[in-house]
Curated annotation (Swiss-Prot):
The lineage of its organism: Bacteria, Bacillati, Actinomycetota, Actinomycetes, Mycobacteriales. The gene is recR. One of its GO terms (biological process) is DNA repair. CDD domains: H3TH_StructSpec-5'-nucleases (cd00080), TOPRIM_recR (cd01025). One of its GO terms (molecular function) is zinc ion binding. This is Recombination protein RecR. Pfam families: RecR_C, RecR_HhH, RecR_ZnF, Toprim_4. It comes from the Bacteria. Keywords: DNA damage, DNA recombination, DNA repair, Metal-binding, Zinc, Zinc-finger. NCBIfam families: recR. Residues 79-179 form the Toprim domain. May play a role in DNA repair. It seems to be involved in an RecBC-independent recombinational process of DNA repair. It may act with RecF and RecO.
Length: 203
């Protein structure tokens, strides 16, 4: 254990996902060794993120405006909506260059042990969005692209049940080929692109 601000820094870094005690200590001592202007730039960026980044009012993606750049882009196909768990999954799909629709971020997946169920996810917002015809466009297909793990599959099954009776709506699931138990963000572009292209109807 270190003392004072150094230990405080290690403790705060250790709260970040994927950062264990040793990694937190290593990062902390790296920060202590860099020049003050570098620290100033880092703190300035963190302040900008804290004060200027919000969630898109339409899809839930991270944005510095009311609408993210994808929802604001008139070239995107508003009739297609790809449902993902987290904003980082949008970047994974975008890297494939196979998809030109829009997105809906759930904010996670079912996890009963952590108390996450339908009410904690942005499922109600998805249903409202389908009914409201955003920008005057009917959503005709919802592509479910939750992670291929137990939580993601449970979430996908629930979504199918909620969406299957909506008139004129096709519900699809990205095709198999992604490793079971994996995260969408770690899939390579080719595999994920094929999974999107080969998506299967669920109803």
């Amino acid at each position: 254990m270190f003392e004072g601000p150094v230990q405080d820094l290690i403790d705060e870094l250790g709260k970040l996902p994927g950062i264990g005690p040793k990694s937190a200590q290593r990062i902390a001592f790296h920060l202590l060794s860099v020049e003050p202007p570098d620290i100033d730039r880092l703190t300035a960026v963190l302040a900008k993120v804290r004060d200027g980044v919000r969630f898109c009012a339409v899809c839930g993606n991270v944005s510095d405006d009311e609408r993210c750049r994808i929802c604001a882009d008139p070239r995107r196909d508003g009739a297609l909506v790809c449902v993902v768990e987290e904003p980082k999954d949008i970047q994974a799909v975008e890297r494939t260059r196979e998809y030109r629709g829009r997105y809906h971020v759930l904010g996670g997946a079912f996890d009963p042990l952590s108390g996450i169920g339908p009410e904690q996810l942005r499922i109600r917002e998805l249903l409202t969005r389908i009914g409201d015809r955003v920008d005057g466009v009917d959503i005709t297909e919802v592509i479910i692209a939750t992670d291929p793990n137990t939580e993601g599959e449970a979430t996908a099954t629930y979504l199918v049940r909620m969406l299957r009776d909506i008139p004129g709506l096709t519900v699809t699931r990205i095709a198999s080929g992604l490793p079971m138990g994996g995260d969408l963000e770690f899939a390579d572009e080719l595999t994920l692109g094929r999974a999107l292209t080969g998506r299967r109807a669920m109803v």
